[in-house]
């Protein structure tokens, strides 16, 4: 896939409870992906790791805006991928699980630092 813009992909999918983003890892030319999964009000968890392959990404604001039922977010890539300001503000302050050896890196990374209190080592994850 040669997509460069996936703004509003899966936006307002109000019946979506889970999603596998693995196929998006092959979309290596994406530069903009604002509002991805935004307003998916029944989504309970998401693994954002596949987005790490988007090395050209410059904007991904409001990724999870309005996802009020999220129990957790996981991101198992190192280093942290580019994150726009406010991208993970979802209203419920759920934990963001990252690799154990990368917790400090995530907590100090640009725009990730805004979520430092929510960033936890994946080894502490108890939710399914």
Language-model features: where?
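Solvent-exposed loop and capping/linker segments of extracellular ligand-binding repeat ectodomains
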Residues: 1-128
């Amino acid at each position: 896939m040669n997509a460069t813009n996936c703004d509003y992909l899966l936006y307002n999918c109000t019946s979506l409870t889970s999603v596998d983003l693995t196929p998006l890892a092959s979309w290596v030319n994406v530069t903009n992906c604002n509002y991805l999964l935004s307003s998916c009000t029944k989504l309970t968890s998401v693994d954002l790791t596949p987005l790490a392959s988007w090395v050209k990404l410059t904007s991904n604001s409001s990724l999870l805006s309005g996802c009020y039922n999220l129990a957790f977010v996981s991101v198992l890539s190192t280093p942290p991928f580019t994150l726009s300001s406010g991208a993970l503000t979802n209203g419920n302050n759920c934990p963001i699980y990252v690799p154990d050896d990368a917790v400090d890196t995530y907590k100090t990374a640009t725009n990730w630092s805004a979520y430092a209190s929510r960033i936890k080592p994946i080894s502490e994850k108890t939710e399914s």
